[in-house]
């Protein structure tokens, strides 16, 4: 029986889906798994390569090639289901333009900034790279070198990068692209609870009475989680779904309470709901009195723009953005009382002809939170986080759950959804941000630096105390010539970063700078670099991701990378061999540990008795491990166990390394072999003391903070010259910049190019028809696309939406590089543009 690969994928996926639904498939489908040809495949588990949901997949390998994938029925997250991107996982590694050897810009046999990309050996690539890094460190010091990493790094890669940059090069100029997606969530968690990441888990979905989406199109961005929400809504008819967004999208199809609002006005609506809860006497007084305190945050904090920007200069408190002062409950109640229904509607309603309907929906939404009998899960993603007041928005959604006590119990959860597969596990938990260390530690805290130096066996004072350049600032410093040696891994910031014409591309092509990009395909970012390093991806290496519900998942290396491609982990560790401590550390630091003199950073960081303590025999003999073979010890296990020591006993407990290869992921803290589903609640969280009920132990007093924060306008709004709001985002078929999904023929054909979604009346007013080519123009740049007046996304009048997956249509030429001043996360959801027919 011969079965085509396409038919096999389709039928096995159908079988997995059917088994979850309790459906029996025809014999032809069921018999596939017993076919002789198919039994030659080796199946192994792995988490999906795409979003932060953390779906489990089964991966089939034959002849050192991934030939099929299907949803893993044993995975708790997705229960055998895949979205359309996960369905085509087997194809993402095999694009025709896969990078397989290092490429250096050269002219006449030498490196030249303006030369052509030329194939070179790894030795030649690292020779040039090391020379450039050493030159910069010698001339300008460690603050002139930097790295931009990723929420797609494995846990091991991110941890190795933290050690290399913050300890080896003594530079905190390390930031992940998670700065663009999750920094506001992190800052919100830390300000309210003193600890990062959600207190709930996906198990909330099956017992909640209401779901509220704030700036989250789960139907397309988290479709597997949306299937669970949909199942709950349809199987429990009393369940309600509210969807709030600046435009109508596919998630609205399930909405009982649909609300389209004016950009930035979510701040006002959040305060209105808090006011509604208080005025209707629905505050959970016992919970609030025992477990919360109230603070008022500093206002008028600016927008993270360059200091000479007039809007930034006008801010009164740009130098104390995170400050706050204690207030009472009565003072908080008075503060939010301004946000009554009329005032909030005036700020938030984009369609004045539907004012009555808007008010009705807003009241229904407020009642979901206020009614003590209704268990509520709030979801949000980029609508909250990519926001010039993103940290505030996160704090304010917690206000609603804390005022009502709807938190940390099954079905009651404020749930920040993650965009990348390991934005939680790597960027946040490992601490690859410019101000962080592992397990919520920060470089500004002397005790935290001391702890890290102790674990890493380094001399006191190795880790700098000043935070480094964050993502947006890195681009500005590259342009200004203050950041000169720069390594980019697992991201495509030239397509993703805002205002790229003015603040991105100039820095990459600055003659004083040497830019290295490690990637699997020739992305926009790679083509702007001076050296391209070919990387292994996904199951071409052993890895670990941490998903949105604190679930850490491992996988084995299943196939070899093509050609000379090497994992980012191998690149980081191998590169460290080219630096002796004398070349990167001052003499007074070496004098504190003279036994390190003459050693390489590889010796100091990765052969320190911790990382190299697990021998090759610990590697599972059924699987290859390229890094273990290269370095002679089980590198991943050593890195993980050293990293895990930061969090064990501190509320971030991870299980022993080997447990993860056996399980379909475990949710931390894992104490005495048991994972934690709900944090901060007695009886569920082992860190909560008996008799306390709840304990928000990230804060010294064990209490969560309810913040009084106002509505503040965005830095740029539509006017006569630029009359439209621009919002950017993703679509179901593509992930981030499309560098993987656009190389899958089926996904490319499903949505080949980006378009400008526009209200039909706006299009008619401009004399535009569907399919007409236009320019989207802002004060910073312009790009060409085509108008779409139908389909899945339906903006209100006055707003356009353009997805950013298309490398041929760089919408980030247009966007504004304003940030939340607290989280330093970019606001990609609002700026002013005009639309002009070509």
Curated annotation (Swiss-Prot):
Biological process annotations from GO: cellular respiration; Mo-molybdopterin cofactor biosynthetic process; nitrate assimilation
Signal peptide from the UniProt entry: 1-29
GO CC, alphabetical: membrane; nitrate reductase complex; periplasmic space
Primary enzyme class: oxidoreductase
Record-annotated 4Fe-4S Mo/W bis-MGD-type domain positions: 41-97
Modifications the protein undergoes after translation, according to the UniProt entry: Predicted to be exported by the Tat system. The position of the signal peptide cleavage has not been experimentally proven.
Keyword Iron-sulfur: yes
Pfam families: Molybdop_Fe4S4 (PF04879), Molybdopterin (PF00384), Molydop_binding (PF01568)
Residues bound to substrate: 804
Cofactor: [4Fe-4S] cluster; Mo-bis(molybdopterin guanine dinucleotide)
Compartments where found: Periplasm
Single GO molecular function: molybdopterin cofactor binding
Residues engaged in binding [4Fe-4S] cluster: 48, 51, 55, 83
Amino acids binding Mo-bis(molybdopterin guanine dinucleotide): 85, 152, 177, 181, 214-221, 245-249, 382, 386, 492, 518-519, 541, 568, 728-737, 812, 829
Coiled-coil intervals: none
Gene3D superfamilies membership: 2.40.40.20, 3.30.200.210, 3.40.50.740, Dimethylsulfoxide Reductase, domain 2
Subunit-structure text: Component of the periplasmic nitrate reductase NapAB complex composed of NapA and NapB.
Protein name: Periplasmic nitrate reductase
